[in-house]
From Swiss-Prot:
Cited function: Cell wall formation.
A Pfam family it matches: MurB_C
Protein family: Belongs to the MurB family.
Pathway assigned in UniProt: Cell wall biogenesis; peptidoglycan biosynthesis
EC number: 1.3.1.98
Localisation: Cytoplasm
UniProt keyword annotation of DNA-binding present: no
GO cellular component annotations of the record: cytosol
Keyword vocabulary terms for this entry: Cell cycle, Cell division, Cell shape, Cell wall biogenesis/degradation, Cytoplasm, FAD, Flavoprotein, NADP, Oxidoreductase, Peptidoglycan synthesis
Enzyme class per UniProt: oxidoreductase
Protein name stated in the entry: UDP-N-acetylenolpyruvoylglucosamine reductase
Amino acid sequence: MMESGEALLKKLDGRLSGLRGRLTPDTGMDKITWFRAGGPAQVLFQPSDEEDLSAFLKAVPEEIPLLVVGIGSNLLVRDGGVPGFVVRLSAKGFGEVEQVCDTQLRAGAAAPDKRVAAAALEAGLAGFHFYHGIPGGIGGALRMNAGANGVETRERVVEVRALDRKGEVHVLSNADMGYAYRHSSASPDLIFTSVLFEGVPGERDDIRRAMDEVQHHRETVQPVREKTGGSTFKNPEGTSAWKEIDKAGCRGLRVGGAQMSEMHCNFMINTGNATGHDLETLGETVRARVFENSGIRLHWEIKRLGLFREGEQIEEFLGKIV
């Protein structure tokens, strides 16, 4: 069991006094994640801007755990909570999107994907319509190479600005990000703060039509009005995760308050009172049944974070304790 957030802040007494952002001990992550489940962050920090974030990183000893989250759309937090500091970039300091030249946009890491799509439409830049259908923020999109409708984040990235654990600035090229399917090999210790995107001039009517098609498709096939974290598993090579889940008889499968959506069975939903343990157990049960049915090993797309409650554990489907 982790100690209280107040105790952690007391240990750092004086180190954090000059920060302008908000420090909140023992904050429920169920208020942040779209699943509306999970234990508390020991301390939540919301920096005012990049300078404030840098000062925070320079003040916090590297042995103290630190986790960065965005708008919470792709996170499953375990019920024992998240030790150390959880950093959440605010829309006020990191959420702006601006056109910097004819074909380029700069976006803060806390900007919702939809805001980037809207800014691109206003600027007459094609190639960003897919963001209109992704329920997340740009920081997460950069980290996992988010994509939809056959387009990926890596196709639009010019460079990414980031801070390391020492608070130093780094500028990463597209190649530095090491993109692959739903993955970036950039150091997990880097905190992305903004990105420079490159688009292609296009007709606004065509861009708007593409965005409308994305939105219509999403509302037609995805449980957009449920408490969900988005796609649960990455698509295996040569097939779709939802097809394998369906073939294994897992559409609508429930564990406690967690369910694989009847509408789109690669989406886990919280039906009202699911715990983090319910959600993760359901996911591992689905992985086991798919493997038994087809020999395919599904890999989590949702990020699982934090500690189990005392006395709890979950076996991965191959019998390995996680």
